[in-house]
Curated annotation (Swiss-Prot):
Swiss-Prot/TrEMBL GO biological process terms: animal organ development; growth hormone receptor signaling pathway; positive regulation of growth; positive regulation of receptor signaling pathway via JAK-STAT; response to nutrient levels
Name of the protein this chain belongs to: Somatotropin
Cellular compartment(s): Secreted
Signal peptide: 1-22
Chain's role: Growth hormone plays an important role in growth control and is involved in the regulation of several anabolic processes. Implicated as an osmoregulatory substance important for seawater adaptation.
GO molecular function terms listed in the Swiss-Prot or TrEMBL record: growth hormone activity; growth hormone receptor binding; metal ion binding
Keyword tags: Disulfide bond, Hormone, Metal-binding, Secreted, Signal, Zinc
Pfam families (UniProt xref): Hormone_1
Domain of life according to the entry: Eukaryota
SS bond list: 71-183, 200-208
């Protein structure tokens, strides 16, 4: 009888711990989604304010440039469409999100300097800090998915492509400033999509269509 009670106690403790871990993971996922949503909204606000500050002819010229431009993230392996995104594992989506956020930590310093003080976007110098916080959160989620298993993804140890890709952009170069902002918005949209799908995929009953 005593052994049965001990066994029951251990089972209850295990259930309690597992439920607590699941609850904490959900909180971290929700927090990560909220953080990247804010960054995506901030990116959209920045580029909208930037475009509003341009002359009509400048705006028309820039609208033809970006679709043909190359972003740093284009060298980071990632799903190329909705179907591929939905078929990707939670761990893969988290790893890609981590790489994308990491790729902006250093260039975000240039991003802050590119933005005119006259633009009403708040304090752009906080972008680097927000990216660093999100990176830490995603790292914790990745460790949770690994559940103690070694990280076998070789891409995690690879250097980021073109680390100084955005750092040569001059503050007075209209085309390159727009390119910087447009790439930032594009990448934050990617990360938001990947984290939303990853969060949804954790619930088997959820409809994770994009």
């Amino acid at each position: 009888m005593a052994k049965a009670l001990v066994l029951l106690s251990l089972v209850l403790v295990s259930v309690f711990v597992n439920n607590g871990t699941a609850s904490e993971n959900q909180r971290l996922f929700n927090n990560a989604v909220i953080r990247v949503q804010h960054l995506h909204q901030l990116a959209a606000k920045m580029i909208n304010d930037f475009e509003d500050s341009l002359l009509p002819e400048e705006r028309r010229q820039l609208s033809k440039i970006f679709p043909l431009s190359f972003c740093n993230s284009d060298s980071i392996e990632a799903p190329t469409g909705k179907d591929e995104t939905q078929k990707s594992s939670v761990l893969k989506l988290l790893r890609i999100s981590f790489r994308l956020i990491e790729s902006w930590e250093y260039p975000s310093q240039t991003l802050s300097g590119t933005i005119s003080n006259s633009l009403t976007i708040g304090n752009p110098s906080q972008i680097t800090e927000k990216l660093a916080d999100l990176k830490v959160g995603i790292s914790v989620l990745i460790k949770g998915c690994l559940d103690g298993q070694p990280n076998m993804d070789d891409n995690d140890s690879l250097p980021l492509p073109f680390e100084d890709f955005y750092l040569t952009l001059g503050e007075n170069n209209l085309r390159e400033s727009f390119r910087l902002l447009a790439c930032f918005k594009k990448d934050m949209h990617k990360v938001e999509t990947y984290l939303r799908v990853a969060n949804c995929r954790r619930s088997l009953d959820s409809n994770c269509t994009l």
